[in-house]
Regions:
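Conserved tyrosine-mediated DNA breakage-rejoining catalytic core shared by Y-recombinases
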Residues: 116, 125-160
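N-terminal core-binding DNA-recognition domain of tyrosine recombinases/integrases
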Residues: 1-80, 95-99, 173
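Basic, Lys/Arg- and aromatic-enriched nucleic-acid-binding interface segment
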Residues: 93-120, 144
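Short pre-functional
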Residues: 11, 51, 107-121, 223-227
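C-terminal catalytic core of Y-nucleophile DNA break-rejoin enzymes
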Residues: 143-162, 174-197
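Short, polar N-cap/turn motifs at the start of nucleic acid-interacting alpha helices
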Residues: 130-133, 188, 230-231
Length: 231
């Protein structure tokens, strides 16, 4: 959105704050920010504009503390997670051509997501240092939550990763999974989403009204475990 919209939102914010007896920027509190957010008729633009303003104000010494992280998040309705059956997922995995470099990579990453419920972003960012080959564990700090997580390095996952490493492009990068054309860098999670979508379509799996990204493997595993009574 344009500069005029940003200025309008900022003007409304400062006018509202002034009605709350905050006469100076340093007087602005978390409660003021929350009240202004609730009063806004354009919360989406409000959030981004005011977050930027509060960060800028703190960086320039106009405010003693950066309060940008206290701008409330927009409450969104969460739909029902997409779930694919175990048979559908196994069909997709089995159909991957594992004789190619890209096939070995796709199989290993999707297997990690399907068996361990790892988010696609975490699977794509997996590093060699995350794997303990002796203890047979995968230890990461989840990108979305920042929470540490230790998962078992299942035999089939270990085998799939090793087969990919043997075919992996020569690179000193610490990330395991790379794009296969120079310049090498970690695989984007959007590429993994595309690979699963292609597999679903190629195998004739019904995706009507369903999401098709690799994150669906996480929700599918959770659903499968619940059915089996594993919590």
């Amino acid at each position: 959105y344009d500069v005029r919209t940003r200025l309008r939102i900022l003007s409304l914010f400062l006018s509202f704050i002034e009605t709350q007896n905050a006469k100076k920027l340093e007087d602005i509190s978390i409660n003021h920010i929350a009240a202004a957010f609730e009063a806004s008729t354009d919360q989406n633009h409000f959030r981004s504009t005011i977050r930027e303003f509060l960060s800028f104000a703190a960086e320039n010494g106009w405010m003693p503390t950066n309060l940008s992280c206290f701008v409330p998040k927009i409450r969104r309705h969460r739909g029902v997670p997409t779930v694919y059956s175990t048979d559908d997922i196994e069909t997709c995995l089995a159909s991957i051509d594992r004789t190619t470099q890209s096939g070995k990579r796709t199989y290993a990453e999707l297997l990690i997501c399907a068996r361990l419920g790892l988010r696609n972003t975490d699977a794509c960012e997996l590093k060699f240092s995350d794997i303990d080959w002796v203890k047979k564990t995968i230890s990461i700090v989840q990108m979305k939550t920042g929470i540490p997580l230790v998962l078992p390095l299942l035999p089939e996952i270990e085998d799939a990763i090793n087969r990919y490493i043997a075919a992996r492009p020569q690179s000193d990068l610490s990330f395991i999974f790379l794009r296969h054309k120079a310049p090498y860098y970690p695989l984007r999670n959007s590429t993994l989403d595309y690979e699963l979508q292609k597999l679903l379509e190629e195998n004739g799996i019904n995706t009507d009204g369903k999401k098709k990204g690799a994150h669906t493997l996480r929700s599918s595993l959770a659903s499968s475990l619940l059915k089996e009574g594993i919590h």
